[in-house]
Amino acid sequence: HEHHAHRGPKEIAAIFDASAMTTGAKETAHRILDILTDAEAKAHGVARDQVHFHEVGAVDSIVDIAAFAICFDALCRTYAVNDCIVKEITEGCGTIRCQHGILPIPVPAVVNIAAAGGLRLHMTQVAGELVTPTGAAIAAAVKTKDQLPASCQIEAVGLGAGKRVYETAGFLRVFLLDD
């Protein structure tokens, strides 16, 4: 059983503020953190300043948020990205064991983020959590549209995969489009 540091949003925000990230990357990291904080506060029925992250507060999740923010900021500056289209997010089913016990999938924080951020969840029969609260918060933080253009040119493709193994391929595919 691993023990992760329990940090509040102010401590995590201070880590981002003290970093060498660009202003744009810091703004993105703060947006992601704010979305996570709101979702966790609602899930636990507490005020924002009473939220203490368990999994999210772990160093690896802070690094995930910062790394995404840095890469997204660089992408936006390099390619003059105007919009981020998030059509839907694919989620699994069943339950997951976490710091708070056994929770249904999607976990309450993901449900809260999807509802508040206008994210469409495509529910599948894949047993397991395909969308983490951090992943949902990232999508909600950068989403500006939810529909692809009728026609467009694909300029580049990016693929990413997690560590978990499921019965179906689980990866994120991102397109850089020019319409």
Across the structure, where does each feature detected by a protein language model lie?
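Non-catalytic, charge-rich alpha-helical accessory subdomains
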Residues: 45-50, 62
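Conserved phosphate/anionic-ligand binding catalytic regions in large, soluble enzymes, centered on
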Residues: 53-76
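Glycine-rich nucleotide/cofactor/substrate-binding loop typically near the N-terminus or early
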Residues: 1-44, 107-110, 114-136, 149-154
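Long, contiguous binding/interaction regions
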Residues: 50, 57, 135
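Mobile "lid/hinge" segments at catalytic clefts and subdomain interfaces of large enzymes
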Residues: 77-178
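Broad structural signal for hydrophobic residues in well-ordered alpha-helices, predominantly aliphatic
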Residues: 40, 71-72, 139
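Glycine-rich, flexible loop/turn motifs
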Residues: 39, 47-49, 101
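Solvent-exposed loop/linker segments at secondary-structure transitions
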Residues: 31, 54, 87
